Swiss-Prot record:
Cofactors: pyridoxal 5'-phosphate
Role description: The glycine cleavage system catalyzes the degradation of glycine. The P protein binds the alpha-amino group of glycine through its pyridoxal phosphate cofactor; CO(2) is released and the remaining methylamine moiety is then transferred to the lipoamide cofactor of the H protein.
Enzyme class (EC, first level): oxidoreductase
Family under the similarity heading: Belongs to the GcvP family.
GO biological process: glycine decarboxylation via glycine cleavage system
Residue numbers carrying N6-(pyridoxal phosphate)lysine: K723
Species of the source: Burkholderia lata (strain ATCC 17760 / DSM 23089 / LMG 22485 / NCIMB 9086 / R18194 / 383)
Protein name as catalogued: Glycine dehydrogenase (decarboxylating)
A single MF term (Gene Ontology): glycine dehydrogenase (decarboxylating) activity
Gene label: gcvP
Keywords associated with the record: Oxidoreductase, Pyridoxal phosphate
């Protein structure tokens, strides 16, 4: 219902309650252009209505006949109603004190970080920092993360986060496969590694021919393995001295990966000091809530010789055009968007926002604060060990940091029963043993409650905490010789921001350097940078969602699982498929899971030999990278002059590989921003040759409510909840990449048997460390769908298409639109061809991207899917005013280019070639350029009231890769 102007309402009497209710109010805030603006844009395009435009854009053969079947969520809820409904679900969760451990620990999120990072749109609405000049704040925060990890692990270099610890372990395995012992395909996993890590490793190893062996760590050197994974400390709490074992593994030609707890490394000798080649782990306990499994930032650190084989993003130091230090993403030629099937990993989205939180936790506490936390945790564990021994129980592990495995024998069930009565969760190690992992939130009272549980089971009296503390002198339970002596976190950034005032100002100084959605539109094609509404974000910080351990008993997570079930059904309705799994914690992992499901389907039919994956030449780089990881052979299908899949070439390739055809991976609408007219035919050709159709859901924002991959021939898709369904990009993560499948593939959806989650008996192995992946951000998408309802979700899609066509129409006289469908129309994005400009003026797409920064904009997607182009996606959330501001900037830039073409501006000394212009450059005493300072900094009048200044000049990418430096920069360099 449209909210009418109050003056018009006042003239009506009487007013009914129904007339005053505004259930659609959220949709009107989410969708940027109002009715008048939409009509003005439609007039520009020559259409009378949105419906008429959509009829012209989307092929009639694939249009949805019915309204989105959202059931109880078909009608929109107001923001208050949706929050209240979600609160009912959250209250069904039981937040126990969880001492389960197994890689997840409760933690205190410092309030200054909670409010000023996690809840701050300047951080969470930013995109991956591919444009370094407008990303210096989060690049510095991520560089801090890398420095933190490298220092604590004792290794040379760390990446800027991975998806979770289990995924990081799998990435380390494949890294060593590429670089290690050529005569072995064995990866050896010690039997005290986290069980969920082992399961993800097994999932990853099978398609690429790696044999995973498990057994005692002591036997690793005799396994003839190219790599060995050790846990430090082990899942049962043991802290073992691996120095001699590491030497033996190296002597046998193998390499060593260590899964290490970063908090423990403040007091334990780091893996790098005793010869480890790679360290991986999770930074969750550095201030990031457990969140029923995620999101959390994993890490991967390596010796220097492996740096060019690392997966994931890597922040490096370079210089800008003025020779000043600048940060950028380094060694991007390793990544999937460039190397495709030869990439080191398929990871695209990682966990930047959570890595930033973890790094700021280290900045805020500093080395002394972290060590104090670690020593206190270790002391509590030692007091617990002493107490349970007094009560007659034996501890299985004599060495420990924070985890005890306690032999409870026949009293095990009683221990769990008495713990439950005190709202405590313990780890169920076996029928005769329990595990207890304490953390920084464990208090004296908590310790007393734990002792009371064991005392009750023993039929005795719990020893007093103070008495235990007084009687236990100097016991750290760490092996002799493994106490850390090396310094860490010595850089000034970890030693100066310890007051809240200093921390607050540091965080503000970083966020002020960056350009995020809170400042302006981010028109990145294929990225869908839409509104991340505050009401959607609020539940993320509710303790009923954040305080749940991923392996908590099912009866404590009723609300979570009900919300997850509802969200899965919402996505089933949107996609037209039969079932959805929310386990994949990034789009790349959803792709990977989908391809494994296809393989499992073929294998179940006796056709495991089908391993050829057809991929159009225009595909996103994750597609071939994922296919390679899934053990498939990539065969490229040509595209025609209009950017569509070449049907003749598809038929030829399908015929050639008919016996071995596993799948085709297509994106719809295509990566060229067009609804291909023959998508049904593409699906039919592949099906006729025995293959399955994988429809990449990256562009789902152009389909919701209007068409559905499950209805036009798709068998499986992944979605990006961080695109279409409003989870923010976080500066490079978190993301969620659900996999949606047809009915015939539903029984192959992923399980996680190691933790008791079995969705389907025939399901593939786990693809994430937690059963539901990044569960704590799923409420964002639930809220979005609940507040929009069926009609408004469709309206959002239509408006996204309208906005894209409006931009294409307005800019077409200035920049050719490379691809379009019938009537010259595009889908939800358009590609502007700058190649003729390069030929006529020497101005490159990079020059235009950097010049847009001077106008206050993040550049559109550069040179994808076609080199020398810009791909623009405005989404439905941008108003006509903001679209017009972007259009005006692009037209003004075209005029600047024209001045070069006509000889009125020098081909080198012009505002594009020297962009972006910093405040320091513009205000310097000396100005040697042929153009004015005003043209450099204020090329359009609107900048006079709202000017963003890039903090650095153009970053030198070549210098940065040739002089790779990925640690924090000394203060002297900024002088």
């Amino acid at each position: 219902m449209k909210l009418e102007h109050p003056d018009r309402l006042m003239n009506r009497t009487p007013l009914s309650l129904a007339a005053l209710e505004t259930h659609d109010a959220f949709a009107e805030r989410h969708i940027g252009p109002d009715a008048a603006s939409q009509q003005a844009m439609l007039d520009t395009l020559g259409f009378a209505s949105r419906a008429a435009l959509i009829d012209a854009v989307i092929p009639a053969s694939i249009r949805r006949a019915e309204t989105l079947p959202l059931g109880p969520f078909a009608q929109p809820k107001s923001e208050a109603e949706a929050l209240a409904a979600l609160r009912v679900l959250a209250d069904k969760n039981e937040v126990f004190r969880s001492y389960i451990g197994q890689g997840y620990h409760d933690t205190h999120t410092p309030a200054v970080i909670l409010r000023n990072v996690l809840e701050n749109p300047a951080w969470y609405t930013a995109y991956t920092p591919y444009q370094p000049e407008i990303s210096q704040g989060r690049l510095e925060a991520l560089l801090n993360f890398q420095q933190m990890v490298a220092d604590l692990t004792g290794l040379a270099i760390s990446n800027a986060s991975l998806l979770d610890e289990a995924t990081a372990a799998a990435e380390a395995m494949t890294l060593l496969q590429r670089t290690g012992k050529p005569t072995s395909n064995v990866f050896y996993v010690a039997d005290d590694v986290l069980p969920q890590t082992l399961e993800v490793i097994r999932t990853r190893a099978l398609p690429v021919g790696i044999e995973v062996k498990t057994g005692p760590a002591a036997d690793a050197a005799q396994a003839n393995a190219f790599g060995v994974l050790l846990q430090y400390p082990g899942v049962n709490g043991d802290v073992r001295d691996y120095r001699a074992l590491t030497e033996a593994i190296h002597a046998a030609g193998g390499h060593v990966v260590v899964a290490a707890d970063l908090l423990a490394l403040t007091v334990l000798t780091p893996p790098g000091d005793w010869g480890a080649d790679v360290a991986i782990g999770n930074t969750q306990r550095f201030g990031v809530p457990m969140g029923f499994g995620g999101p959390h930032a994993a890490y991967l650190a390596v010796r220097d010789e492996f740096k060019r084989q690392m997966p994931g993003r890597l922040v490096g130091v370079t210089v800008d055009a003025q020779g000043k230090p600048a940060l950028r993403l380094a060694l991007q030629t390793r990544e999937q968007h460039i190397r495709r099937e030869k990439a080191t990993s398929n990871v695209c989205t990682a966990q930047a926002l959570l890595a930033i939180m973890a790094s700021m936790y280290a900045v805020y506490h500093g080395p002394h604060g972290l060590k104090t936390i670690a020593l206190r945790v270790n002391r509590i564990a030692a007091l617990l060990a002493a107490g349970v021994k007094q009560l007659g129980f034996a501890t299985v592990n004599d060495t420990f940091f924070d985890t005890l495995t306690i032999d409870t024998g026949a009293r095990t069930a009683q221990v769990h029963e008495f713990a439950k009565a005190k709202r405590i969760n313990l780890r169920r190690v076996s029928d005769t043993q329990v595990g207890v992992s304490v953390d920084e939130t464990t208090t004296r009272d908590d310790l007393a409650d734990l002792l009371a549980v064991f005392a009750q089971a023993a039929g005795g009296t719990a020893p007093a905490v103070d008495a235990l503390d007084a009687g236990l002198a100097g016991v750290a339970a760490l092996p002799a010789g493994l106490e850390r002596t090396s310094a860490y976190l010595t850089h000034h950034v970890f030693n100066r921001h310890h007051s809240e005032t200093e921390m607050l100002r540091y965080l503000r100084s970083l966020s002020d350097k960056d350009l995020a959605l809170d400042r302006s539109m981010i028109p990145l094609g294929s990225c869908t940078m839409k509104l991340n509404a505050t009401s959607e974000m609020l539940p993320v910080t509710w303790p009923e969602f954040g305080g749940i351990h991923p392996f908590a008993p099912a009866e404590q997570t009723v609300g979570y699982r009900e919300m997850i079930d509802q969200l899965e059904q919402m996505l089933v309705a949107a996609t037209g498929y039969a079932a959805v799994s929310l386990q994949p914690n990034a789009g790349s992992q959803g792709e990977y899971a989908g391809l494994l499901i296809i393989h499992a389907y073929h294998a179940s039919r006796g056709e495991a030999h089908r391993d050829v994956c057809l991929i159009p030449a225009s595909a996103h780089g994750t597609n071939p990278a994922s296919a390679h990881m899934a053990g498939m052979k990539v065969v490229v299908v040509a595209c025609d002059a209009q950017g569509n899949v070449d049907i003749a070439d598809l038929k030829a390739k399908a015929d050639e590989h008919a016996k071995d055809l596993a799948a085709i991976m297509i994106t719809y609408p295509s990566t060229h921003g067009v609804f291909e007219q023959n998508v049904r035919e593409i699906c039919e050709i592949v099906h006729a040759h025995g293959g399955q159709v994988y429809v990449d859901g990256a562009n789902m924002n152009a389909m919701v409510g209007l068409t559905a991959p499950g209805q036009f021939g798709g068998d499986v898709s992944h979605l990006n909840l961080h695109k279409t369904f409003c989870i923010p990009h976080g500066g490079g993560g978190p993301g969620v990449g659900p996999v949606a499948v047809g009915a015939h593939l539903a029984k192959f959806l992923p399980n996680q048997r190691s933790t008791g989650y079995t969705r389907e008996e025939d399901g593939i192995g786990a693809v994430s460390a937690a059963p539901y992946g990044s569960a704590s951000i799923l409420p964002i998408s639930w809220m979005y769908i609940a507040m929009m309802g069926a009609k408004n979700l469709t309206a959002a899609t239509e408006t996204a298409i309208l906005n894209a066509n409006y931009i294409a129409k307005r800019l077409a006289p200035h920049y050719p639109v490379l691809y379009s469908g019938p009537g010259g129309l595009v889908a939800h994005e358009c590609i502007l061809d700058l190649r003729p400009i390069k030929e006529s003026s020497g101005i490159s797409v990079d020059d235009v991207a950097k010049r847009l920064m001077d106008y206050g904009f993040h550049a559109p997607t550069m040179s994808f899917p076609v080199p020398g182009t810009l791909m623009v996606e405005p989404t439905e959330s941008e108003s006509q005013e903001e679209l017009d501001r972007f259009i005006a900037a692009m037209i003004a830039i075209r005029d600047e280019i024209r001045a070069v073409e006509e000889g009125r501006a020098d081909r080198e000394d012009n505002p594009l070639r020297h962009a972006p212009h910093t405040a320091a450059v513009v205000t310097a005493n000396e100005w040697l350029h042929a153009y004015s300072r005003e043209q450099a900094a204020y090329p359009v009048a609107s900048l006079g009231t709202n000017k963003y200044w890039p903090p650095v000049g153009r970053a030198d990418n070549v210098y940065g890769d040739r002089n790779l430096f990925c640690s924090c920069v000394p203060m002297s360099e900024y002088a």
